[in-house]
Design a protein with these regions (language model features):
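Basic, nucleic-acid-binding surfaces and adjacent catalytic neighborhoods in DNA/RNA-processing proteins
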Residues: 11-138
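Compact, glycine/acidic-enriched structural inserts
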Residues: 1-6
Length: 138
């Protein structure tokens, strides 16, 4: 589970250190980390300054630690705001989520952020939004 205290950088590093798969796709793998969807994956990677194109094998333990911190930060914030209502999502009580008003990159193609522009690419059939200059794994 993405918010579990059992999720550690060492465990993730061990599972992805030889992976030729981009980190965005790794985040969407529910068998590895349950609870991260497409929208949150883009937001998490932006928050951690990691390119969605980075292969699992190229992530150092220090970047995985940043990634886990961002996973917890973004998902807790999303829960606080009731999730994201992009189309017709409603919570169990029928209310709309409001986290979409906090998106930094998702669905913001062309928006200027810190001297960069949000770019949209498609990975494994899913839209990915990121800032190439800002998400440089540093």
């Amino acid at each position: 589970d993405a918010l579990s205290p059992d999720l550690t950088a060492q465990k993730i590093f061990k599972k992805i250190s030889k992976s030729e798969v981009p980190i965005k796709q790794i985040l969407l793998n529910q068998k590895l980390i349950a609870g991260i969807g497409n929208i949150y994956a883009s937001e998490i990677l932006f928050d951690s300054k990691i390119s969605p194109l980075t292969l699992g094998k190229d992530l150092e333990i220090s970047l995985i630690m940043k990634l886990i911190k961002s996973i917890r930060k973004i998902l807790k914030k999303a829960i606080k705001y009731g999730g994201s209502s992009i189309r017709d999502y409603r919570s169990t009580d029928g209310t709309l989520g409001n986290f979409q008003s906090n998106f930094k990159v998702y669905n913001k193609e062309g928006k200027k952020i810190g001297g960069d522009k949000v770019k949209k690419i498609v990975q494994y059939g899913r839209s990915t939004f990121y800032c190439p200059k800002l998400q440089n794994n540093k």
